[in-house]
């Protein structure tokens, strides 16, 4: 019987495992007032201002997609994070491709870790690629983090090619926090330049919890 080919081993996931969410800087005041980043289906009816940067069509699909593990529900019951920066969604926002164009100086990254979420006892799931991808696999056990292609999640090139037909899907692997993500679990805010950092620091000046604010130009286009 022929020996099966040796499959390449998956890289060991980073520990701690960073997760990244992009938001409009104008929304930081609302997040601070609420003390949480809320999932779309669980936003308080408090009338506070919110500037959306999402794709309406994609958001509608996420509202219909059942989550097959963990706390269940649908994708919009969760706060979404990526496992790496420089997402295809940020590129679309930067270029205005089928979404409202927003200058990247107005976009901040909220950075936490998988371990912080799990340690706080929050419900979560994660996908090995974009959750809307036909073959996306859902997990709720951190022992399965090696199913995520972290090399692709952190790659600067993510376009689909004949050699890498699912690279764009894998770049968008998601970590989803059920219902709400406490502001206290955000450990870093990344921005594109010093002016944006000054703006964020001004907003955070009155916050009890003040994550570090850093200029991360390589996270942007």
Each PLM stretch: what is its role?
Residues 1-82, 87-221:
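Active-site-proximal loop/hinge segments that shape catalytic or ion-binding/gating pockets
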């Amino acid at each position: 019987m022929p020996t099966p080919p040796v499959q390449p081993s998956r890289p060991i996931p980073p520990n701690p495992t960073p997760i990244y969410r992009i938001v409009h800087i104008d929304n930081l005041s609302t997040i601070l007032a609420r003390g949480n980043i809320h999932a779309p289906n669980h936003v308080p009816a408090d009338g506070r201002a919110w500037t959306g940067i999402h794709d309406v069509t994609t958001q509608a699909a996420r509202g219909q997609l059942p989550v097959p593990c963990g706390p269940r529900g649908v994708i919009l019951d969760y706060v979404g994070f990526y496992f790496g920066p420089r997402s295809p969604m940020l590129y679309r926002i930067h270029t205005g491709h089928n979404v409202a164009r927003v200058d990247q100086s107005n976009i901040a990254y909220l950075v936490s870790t998988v371990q912080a979420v799990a340690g706080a006892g929050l419900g979560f799931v994660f996908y090995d690629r974009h959750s809307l991808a036909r073959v996306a696999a859902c997990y709720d056990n951190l022992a399965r983090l090696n199913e995520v292609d972290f090399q692709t999640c952190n790659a600067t090139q993510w376009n689909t090619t004949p050699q890498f037909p699912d690279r764009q899907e894998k770049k968008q692997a998601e970590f989803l926090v059920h219902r709400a993500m406490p502001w206290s679990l955000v450990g870093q805010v990344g921005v594109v330049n010093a002016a944006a950092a000054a703006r964020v620091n001004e907003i955070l000046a009155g916050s009890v919890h003040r994550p570090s604010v850093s200029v991360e130009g390589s996270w942007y286009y």
